[in-house]
């Protein structure tokens, strides 16, 4: 068990000038001190990069270059990450509060745990998804939680995402 591990938060973006800043602020204003913030931008042309540059001193690594879609960008983030845990916080997504990471990672986490997840606020009115417990076999057919609310141990990303699988997000 390890206290206060390094958390890599990866934001992928493409032409997200209207939403990237709120995401950056949500990450860099976390009270948890052990955060490596990574932004992988797909070569935006709308001013997104200017906003990223504005906060460059608070971002461990960022790049803006063409990619093959969201999962290629996420794989770039995985390869760059040095943290023990990874979270994918896309442009436009926010942590629920400034102390979200502190609440999750300030206590010891059993070495056998490889994924941590929580509820997600679905809209600004505060409507929350209802947490449900699914058998592990459910993950073979569907993701029972949003990646924005999950933290996965780096060991779960040995091979990254398979770019050959069809995705509705591409």
Task: Locate each region found by the language model.
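N-proximal low-complexity "stem/linker" segments adjacent to membrane-targeting elements
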Residues: 1-29
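Acidic helix N-cap motif at the loop->helix transition within catalytic regions
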Residues: 18-21, 46-54
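Conserved short acidic donor-positioning loop in nucleotide-sugar-dependent glycosyltransferases
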Residues: 27, 42-43, 68-69
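A conserved acidic beta->alpha catalytic loop
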Residues: 33, 41-50, 90
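Glycine-rich, basic loop-to-helix element that forms the pyrophosphate-binding segment
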Residues: 64-81
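Short aromatic/hydrophobic "clamp" motif used to bind/position activated sugar donors
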Residues: 86
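Conserved donor NDP-sugar-binding/catalytic core segment of glycosyltransferases
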Residues: 94, 98-130
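Conserved nucleotide-sugar donor-binding catalytic segment
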Residues: 118, 129-170
């Amino acid at each position: 068990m390890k206290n206060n591990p390094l958390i890599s938060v990866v934001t992928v973006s493409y032409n997200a000038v209207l939403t990237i800043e709120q995401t950056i602020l949500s990450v860099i204003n976390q009270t948890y001190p052990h955060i490596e913030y990574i932004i992988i931008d797909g070569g935006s042309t709308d001013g997104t990069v200017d906003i990223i540059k504005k906060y460059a001193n608070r971002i461990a690594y960022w790049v803006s270059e063409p990619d093959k879609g969201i999962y290629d960008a996420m794989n770039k983030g995985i390869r760059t990450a040095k943290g023990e845990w990874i979270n994918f916080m896309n442009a436009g997504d926010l942590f629920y509060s400034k102390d979200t990471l502190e609440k999750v990672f300030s206590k010891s986490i059993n070495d056998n745990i490889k994924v941590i997840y929580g509820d997600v606020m679905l809209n600004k009115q505060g409507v929350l998804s209802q947490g449900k417990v699914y058998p592990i076999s459910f993950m073979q057919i569907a993701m029972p939680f949003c990646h924005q609310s999950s933290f996965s141990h780096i060991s779960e990303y040995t091979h990254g995402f398979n770019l050959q699988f069809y995705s509705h997000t591409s």
